[in-house]
Structures are given as structure tokens and as C-alpha cells.
Amino acid sequence: MGKYFDMLMEDVRMKEGLHSCMNCGVCTGVCPAAEFYNYDPRQIVNIVQTRDDDAIEELLKSDTIWYCGECMSCRPRCPRGNTPGYVIQALRTLSQKLGFFVESEKGRQQLALKRIIGENILRTGYCIVPRLVKPELHPEQGTVWQWIYDNDKEVYGQFTPVYMRHGAGALRRLDEQSLEDCLLYTSDAA
């Protein structure tokens, strides 16, 4: 009993985020995610404090830990100085480390997002590249996005004179050497 709790306590965010929760519920009362989901940060902290491996494992495999928007509204309001947002960040990290996130739909969505952003960074040097957000893959963006996509040089040219061209400035095309350096840096870090 407590092996997952011990693993969580190795994360500095747990040491900063969990002192001694008294279950007052202020964190849940101010949580924006609790307005949209069946989500209760107080309950998550309560489960973690029990040190019950089965209950913590259930959390690590659930969508619940992925509902938090990490706004940290909970941080300044807790009368005991807890930060449920930090506890949830530590839970997410452990879920990823143990591979439990794949049992959660929201966890799998995070993986897909991480892959897309990572691939964009390695290909272009940017997290989000407007040219790679294809209108046919994102119909929710509507006709305005189609127009922006079709006229990107004109639209983004208003913000930067070097849109997807070499030079200094935002949204510039990075030279191949810089992109290779990014790739070397990320492979060295792994």
C-alpha cells in the first residue's frame, strides 16, 4: 500500500502542492473545469491522500486527471496552501511514465497533440504552423479559416515581412542547420 503515493512524492510538485488537505472544497468551488465536467479537484486530492494504490491507479487510468486546465485558480485560494493543480500535474506525469494514460481517451488525445506539436517543431521550428492546419481536417474552423489558409501570405504578411521566408522575424523559415540542431538537441536529451 502506498507505492504509487511514494512515486508521486518523488515529484517536486507533490511536495509543493500537497500539505494537508482538510477537504473544504474551495478548490472545486473556484475551478473552471468543474463547471464543464464531472470534476472535483478536492476528491482527487482526497484519493491521493488515502495512499490507496487501487484508487490512485484508477485515477491514473481515468479521464479525470486530464480535465484540469492548469489555470491554478486553486493555488491562491486554498486556506492550507495546497495546490491541487500541482498534484494533478504530478498524477499526469506518473500516468505517462507508467503508460496508464493510454487507458484514458483524454490521455490518448494528449499524446496525439504532443506528437503533432513535436513533429511541427522538428519540421519547421514552430509549435503551430498555420499552413499545416488544413481546413479539410478542421471543418469546425469554418469558411473564415479556409479564406485565411488560401490567403496566408497576404494575411500573415501584415504581421511579419518574412512569413515562411528566410530572414529575421516571427514566422520566418528556419534554415536547415537550425532545424538539424533542434533534432540533435532533442535526440541528445532523450
Model-derived features: positions:
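A hydrophobic membrane-anchoring alpha-helix module
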Residues: 157-174
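Ferredoxin-type iron-sulfur electron-transfer modules in oxidoreductases and energy-metabolism complexes
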Residues: 1-13, 36-67, 81-146, 162
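Conserved small/polar residues in nucleotide/adenosyl-binding loops
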Residues: 185-190
